[in-house]
Regions:
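ABC transporter nucleotide-binding domain
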Residues: 172-269
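Short beta->alpha junction loops/turns
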Residues: 69, 105, 233, 271, ...
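C-terminal coupling/interaction segments
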Residues: 270-314
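A generic structural signal for secondary-structure junctions
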Residues: 81, 107, 220-224, 253, ...
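Residues at or immediately flanking beta-strands
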Residues: 61, 94, 227, 288-291
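ABC transporter nucleotide-binding domains
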Residues: 2-7, 12-211
């Protein structure tokens, strides 16, 4: 498998002081859907703009399909389709006119009618952009990225604000591009989206990659297999912290402990060993269990454990 995107020791410093990217290295294979996750200010946008050739790094090397921006920028731009989180499209144009406009920027674009059909926009081809729904606008933004017949698709928060049906329609479009051999670099605030779409992903914080791998491997390696969430209170209905976190950490099969949304969350391998010991510990404290649930560990658990906050809190 060939390498589609590669960067080595990427650094970007603003005003000689603020380090937005700190020695970041990535290698994305052709045909992969790769996710870049991180809180606001983590360096994701700066990294992507450097990879897209829009921003010059302070130091480090970038290679797109084996070529450098310094040597072959004009041809390389033909290979990239870019859809930003809030792509600004003229409301005075029709859907067809918008796609035709973007197609005119490239030497060998795809058929506009073909792209409109693929994005399920044929019936809206003569509608004004200003009259489209949120989901239709997002599909149009992706259409403007696909009409150039790209080899690599950069998608920045492609489904933000969409209803579940519109999100799934875009997921199928992304999967279709990937099935045809395309490479996708995706940023998203939706953990379920990253788990469903991404073959591999990297979590970025403070300009550095702090974890990288497939969603399943990251969950297994960093999130535990299961999560036990609980809250306790005093028997007299007063508040009780229910013991320090260190007290829960010594329970059987517990890998990590954190406070999460007013509850204690335990990452565990074998909940059938943890829960009886937890109930016994709560009883010995003289406390009352107010809430108890178990679930499969998720990518969200990995993110919270690594960064200390939920991605949607940003």
């Amino acid at each position: 498998m060939t390498v589609a995107i590669q960067c080595r020791d990427l650094r970007k410093t603003y005003d000689g002081k603020v380090e937005a990217v700190r020695g970041l290295s990535l290698e994305i294979q052709t045909g992969e859907c790769f996710g870049l996750l991180g809180p606001n200010g983590a360096g994701k946008t700066t990294t992507i703009e450097i990879l897209e050739g829009l921003l010059e790094p302070t130091s480090g090397e970038v290679s797109i399909l084996g070529h450098s921006w310094r040597e072959n920028a004009r041809e390389m731009r033909e290979w990239l389709g870019i859809s930003l989180q809030e792509t600004r499209l003229s409301e005075k144009l029709t859907v067809r006119e918008t796609v035709e406009l973007f197609a005119s920027f490239y030497r060998e674009p795809r058929s506009c009618e073909e792209v409109l059909e693929e994005l399920q926009l044929t019936e809206k081809a003569d509608a004004w952009v200003g009259k489209l729904s949120g989901g239709q606008r997002q599909r149009l933004a992706v259409a403007t990225a696909l009409v150039c017949n790209p080899k690599i698709l950069f998608l920045d928060e492609p489904t933000t604000g969409l209803d579940p049906q519109s999100r799934r329609q875009l997921w199928e479009i992304i999967r279709g591009f990937q099935r045809d051999g395309g490479t996708v670099l995706l940023t998203t605030h939706y953990m379920d989206e990253a788990e469903r779409l991404c073959d591999r992903l990297a979590i970025v914080d403070h300009g550095e990659i702090i974890a990288e791998g497939s969603p399943a491997s990251l969950i297994e390696r960093l999130g535990g297999h299961h999560v036990v969430e609980f809250a306790v209170g005093a028997k007299d209905n007063g508040s009780s912290e229910g013991g320090a976190l260190a007290e829960w950490r010594v329970l059987p099969s517990v890998e990590s402990v954190r406070e999460d949304d007013g509850m204690v969350a335990l990452s565990v391998k074998e909940p059938h060993l943890t829960i009886p010991a937890l109930l016994d510990a709560v009883g010995k404290q003289g406390s009352v269990l107010q809430h108890l649930t178990t679930r499969q560990a998720s990518l969200e658990d990995v993110f919270v454990r690594l960064t200390g906050r939920h991605l949607r809190e940003e």
